[in-house]
Amino acid sequence: MKITDLKMVPTKVGYRHQLIIKIETDEGIYGLGESGLSFRELAVMGALRHYRELLIGKDPFKIGAIWQDLYRSQYFEGGRVLAAAISAIDIALYDIKGKALGVPVYELLGGKHRDYVPLFATIGRPVGQAMIDGAHELLAAGWTAIRTGMHAPHEVNDAGEGVFEPWESVGETARWLNRLREAVGDRAMIGIDYHHRLSVAEAASFCQKLGRDTLDFLEEPIRDETPEAYEALRRMTHVPFAIGEEFASKWQFLPYIERGITRSEEHTSELQSRFGISY
């Protein structure tokens, strides 16, 4: 079996701009993959055009070798755009191999370990009473882990107007999160995604405004470029961090794990769409 083509399909899922790829073979079996770098899908498409020439004629079963070829094929390897492109290819190749062998992908990775994977649901409502109402709806539907977003006063709109006000945000968000915990009790794990909008001081202030048992995880409170910043924040709060959505390589995780900074690596599906399965 040989790879004959790589096709790209930019699409929109809800408000997100996503990129789906299709790798075709000379035996009629094809694989689908996804790039996880939403809103930068055009940049990923540019990288995939480079990689397409390297893929044509390759054996799609040699997934690990292809990953290494793509990653090492140019002097300036790595980075979020290239990692997203490689991950889409990697996922599609596993799809091809699973179809050709007639097995699900997990059989290629050592077999099934469990019958289901725990997930969380995002409330998707503005911070306030609507957030609490949304949480009750999710609990009634059977969810036991929920995530919400932050209060975003004066958020930048589509016209580029407005300025995010962090101090107003942390105060209002913390107040309503404490109320949310009171409302749902211990029936659910609660997390919040701050989309790395805060400084260390702002994130510390936010955590200090929370009750001891309010949050089960705080996702991406600050930028990830310097582990030292997260290390400083780690000393200021007991709240577990969920980190890694911005990472573009497995090596970026190392200092966070070694220093005990993170207790939860970011969503597995997102990591696969950024790094691939072989990674």
Where are each of the predicted segments found?
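Structured beta-strand/loop patches that form or line metal/cofactor-binding pockets in enzymes
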Residues: M1-L32, G36
